[in-house]
Amino acid sequence: MDGRSAEEEERYKWKQSDAFIGAVEGFLVQLEDRLIDFKDIEYKNMKKSAEELLTLYFYKFTEIPMLNRMEAVMEYCVDEYETLCGKSLREDELEIISEKFLSMYESRDIYEIYNWFLEEQGFDTLPEVPLAERYLQYEDVYPVLYLKYRLCQNRQHRDIRHLVIDEMQDYSYLQYVILKELFPCKMTILGDRAQSIDSKEQDVLRFLPKLLGKKGLRVIELKDSYRTTLEIATYAQQITGVEGIHYLERHGKAVEEIRTDKMQAFEQILEKVHLGTDGYEDGYETAAILTMTEKEALEAYAFLKERREDVHYIDRDTSAFKKGITVTTYYLAKGLEFDQVFVLGGDKDHAFYKQYLYICATRALHELGVFVVN
């Protein structure tokens, strides 16, 4: 999210889209002809020609994913042989036969097969490195998972009767496809469209009816907002332009927008923090400084931590939330709420700026200050 170029952003969005799924499905059709080099199989009195194996693979076991299909062909041939011979093969014999069948695959490596797909699409391929040194960029995690799901036998979680998905706006089309395949059950999907961390608001309601089926689909829009003061709620509404929301008539301080330089912003935030632990009878329990990037958050944390003990930094590995002053990025603050929120910095020309400002604003319960840093 920090520092993603326009080209990387477009590539990421494509890899999460229905267009990507269409490209993968087309690739899989061609892959069937490329993936296996059929050869005659002979072990003792068990003999199968390449033509017989091809027929079994393409016509008898078509419902089985490609990387598991040759095992099904082998089991069929072994069962036939054992029936004719009237005895079972030993484990060591089955291992030899299995190796003969599986060696017909040009590759069974999902990583390598995904590289074939990337090459076909004109993208840079993943590094050809030993297994222990492999890693995936975030943009490739779900595409690889989808490809693996299509190529390998996967267990559906039929023991799950009802799936609840929160923050629905942060899931891509591809992720919903994977969830639908893994959990063939009823779902409750919750979220706020305006809080999308995509550069453009993603209205999942445009594609969910098609993906999940319109039958039995019920959409409920909640129009009442109780969490923030009317001043903060109105400020957030002006960012998104969403209308028709009823806000609770709870008034508080006006939202402050302050244009200043970075160091003055740090100093003013320290002055404005109003916690009960500072001796204020009406003091708050929590305050937060939210930034657009991790670099900005770390810089703010370093400055504030030197001046106050109760400053805490939240990163991806944080497991516990503490009272006091929290410093983190806006995307890690999703789902959290604070009595006071200070929005620090951010590039107004950045593709994520509107979502950044809205998410930060909706984290505040009582006071909101927005520092536009020169």
Annotate each predicted stretch with a short phrase.
Residues M1, G122-E128, Y149-H162, Q169-N374:
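Conserved helicase motor core of SF1/SF2 NTP-dependent helicases
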